[in-house]
């Protein structure tokens, strides 16, 4: 069976493990995009350390959970967002102003919507977390 959206599956797995109360989640298959999204989440304090484990196939990420994730998910379709349009998507995906993050793919790499706004960049919405 093939996976249609590995990022959505990875974020859903993190949400489920967090809800059940696990300390560690094993996410597979691993990809560069998933690793970069995890890096942004780690930098903002939503999860602890994560490491890549080679298993001879697609790889596995071992993620330490901290209990700070209420909900996270992938944004489908990947909407193109101008630097002035972030507020519309904040209202759609986040529960309150200033609470949570939208992760955006910009020409400068993955970053949060606040960083993209301050740098004057637009991009494509990848995921949300709060």
UniProtKB/Swiss-Prot annotation:
GO terms for molecular function: rRNA binding; structural constituent of ribosome. Keywords: Ribonucleoprotein, Ribosomal protein, RNA-binding, rRNA-binding. It comes from the Archaea. PROSITE patterns: RIBOSOMAL_S8 (PS00053). GO terms for biological process: translation. The keyword rRNA-binding applies. The keyword Chaperone does not apply. GO terms for cellular component: ribonucleoprotein complex; ribosome. One of the primary rRNA binding proteins, it binds directly to 16S rRNA central domain where it helps coordinate assembly of the platform of the 30S subunit. Belongs to the universal ribosomal protein uS8 family. Part of the 30S ribosomal subunit. This is Small ribosomal subunit protein uS8. The gene is rps8.
